Design a protein with these regions (language model features):
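Helical-face signature of the major facilitator-like transporter fold
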Residues: 16-24, 56, 90, 98-110
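Extracytoplasmic
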Residues: 11-45, 66
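Cytoplasmic helix-loop-helix junction between adjacent transmembrane helices
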Residues: 105-131
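Small-residue-rich segments within alpha-helical transmembrane domains of MFS-like 12-TM solute carriers
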Residues: 24, 28, 94, 110-118
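Conserved MFS/SLC helix-loop-helix module at the cytosolic interface between two early adjacent transmembrane helices
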Residues: 61-100
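Juxtamembrane helix-start elements in MFS-like secondary transporters
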Residues: 44-52
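Residue-level signature of mid-helix packing/kink "hotspots" within the transmembrane helices
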Residues: 28, 56-64, 114
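Helix-breaking motifs and short loop linkers at transmembrane-helix boundaries and internal kinks
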Residues: 42, 74, 95-101, 112, ...
Length: 131
């Protein structure tokens, strides 16, 4: 039974680790598509900057509420919901055709990704010894 419990702990930790790597990709993704956004959709440099910033602002603003939610409902549940929100935001960003949908999608990505690092901290603090 103990071995199975350790396997589950490490599996959840690895899932959160890969999710955090995905978070890093999502943070940098707007830098890759800036030329396409301006050429194909006609976005100005200000709009592109806002698109990139909104994700980071929503990420930062959600840190305290995310911590409260993780403490109340658990890291697994909240990180799962967060990744679903991020996924929907990413799909919306890939299919958007105006700046307002781009803004909404990046806010969703920021909100969704804000829980992953905190969930990792919670899991590590609860499950792994300090040694």
């Amino acid at each position: 039974m103990r071995k199975n419990y350790l396997t589950v702990k490490w599996s959840i930790w690895w899932i959160l680790t890969f999710s955090f790597i995905l978070v890093l990709f999502l943070r940098l993704s707007t830098a890759v598509v800036t030329d396409n956004l301006s050429k194909e959709l006609g976005f100005s440099q200000l709009q592109i900057s806002n698109i990139a910033s909104l994700s980071l602002y929503s990420y930062a603003l959600m840190q305290i509420p995310a911590g409260i939610l993780i403490d109340r409902y658990g890291a697994r549940e909240i990180s799962s919901v967060g990744m679903i929100i991020s996924g929907v935001g990413s799909i919306l960003f890939g299919t958007m055709n105006n700046v307002y949908l781009a803004y909404l999608s990046r806010i969703m990505v920021g909100i969704g990704t804000s829980v992953i690092l905190l969930a990792m901290f919670k899991v590590q603090g609860n499950w792994f010894k300090k040694e």
